[in-house]
């Protein structure tokens, strides 16, 4: 299966993109949804401002889903949907549109990501607390096994764990403990007869990562295969070897893609793809590759085509697929696999002893482990122990002709997309049968308060025109919302005090003494290592809430991290809000995937400093933040 992860702006524009990609030889679809859709908000919600259509396509109701798949027969398509907290809702919309096209749900093929554990640990698009979230997953798996048997209702994602810093051992162990939590919940719900439980196991799929250390990554995949076979046989009694098969798709690593010398990302992507294709016994069933310029911004269709062609050259020009497993019998490979399996088993047992994956999320254990691993990785890069070509070694370069016109080297989203989506959803609400909508939402809430399966009530909501925000809002009233542990503490991931960090800590301490107290920073993990008192209230805050927190906590600097492309809308709002609150002397610093032209505009709007992926040295960043604070207070930035 060859796919590219795609979707942006609107359902209509994304549909055109999908049909172009299919015409180029893509064999399936991988749908990216925007953040409001992922987190259960409509485009006119205050929390959706600046985010509509940015990192994916907005789907607010069945009308949007119809537009998304116009002239694409869903009965013949294999569609992967990267959706988690609202996965049940998007599957209901997909099924409803497929039925309108005349397709039998029993023939539908595809995947919903639906792994909420990794949302608490990495991506952050959770909505409900772990218990109700696991109930939604359980209901959805039980429904699909009985009604959409070719569907993969959950794609357990070790991919995002690696992006959040996981080592290969942590990636294996936390994915397996997530799978155990899900399978135990389905088994204990009684919705699937014991004799048919093998069908549930057979539909569990995984979405993994593959880094540039491709030999170790290939061994990791073989370790995954071995452990999954053991767990499904021993814990769940599945005797059919086919049902125990480790089924996985992959997107290779994005964390390691660099803004500096981004042309080097192509060879990184190729090496990472080899990790999941070289070994036949552990080969991915579906592969999607990131684009070379993802560290710069949203890739263009041409960039996605390049990634697709890489797969096609490997599949159709090389001889890799003509051979059995070329590593079978290798003592080196078998030794590394055994090492990974042993260490992963130990970590699985540690998490299970805590009460399982959900308990390890609620206690903050898993998050702390990932934060510590990621901090260690960053420290190795800063120290030069881990070489990143073009970043901390071999950083002299010729001019890159691919970047001569940087504004055309990335895809941008029209500023009118959001206003059009807001107008469209208001029109949608005005034209539907409101009585039917109210009745469907009332039934949804009633069922949510019982142990009945929620899928039927969700389908009813989809068919009468309920919106994404209304469906999620109704369940928020029953289940509540969740704010996951940050994993940030004074003892997690604190760096060793090398010469540069010692100098930063001295600057922080001296500046604090000059200003009459310890420096206080709103948001921002790196401040801990430098000696800042960090105020971090989690994700998903409006500009007004950020300003209110800055006022309440009397901070010296506000740090904003925005990776979705909404920096041009949201950051100026924070700067204006601080000024209106009388905090003109509180500088704002911003980090994210921000093109140079946007960075210049933000600085003109009053932002003190802009950091992008090329700024890999966290210690140097913190030194610049201290200098920014000193400048804002009329102190010599070089004196501390």
What are the residue ranges of the model-derived segments?
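Catalytic alpha/beta active-site cores
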Residues: 1-217, 235-238, 242-249, 277, ...
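Short beta-strand/loop segments at the ligand-binding rim of alpha/beta enzyme cores
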Residues: 1-2, 245-248, 517-520, 580-590
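Conserved, mostly hydrophobic/aromatic
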Residues: 25, 61, 102, 228, ...
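Short beta-alpha connecting loops at secondary-structure transitions
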Residues: 49-54, 79, 118-128, 161-165, ...
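Flexible glycine/proline-rich, aromatic-decorated loop/lid segments
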Residues: 196-200, 238-252, 260-293, 299-320, ...
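Flexible, glycine-rich loop/tail regions that form catalytic "lids" or insertion modules at the edges
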Residues: 300-301, 305-312, 316-503, 551, ...
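Conserved phosphate-handling catalytic cores of large alpha/beta enzymes
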Residues: 311, 610-639
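Cofactor-cradling patches in redox/metallo enzymes
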Residues: 528-623
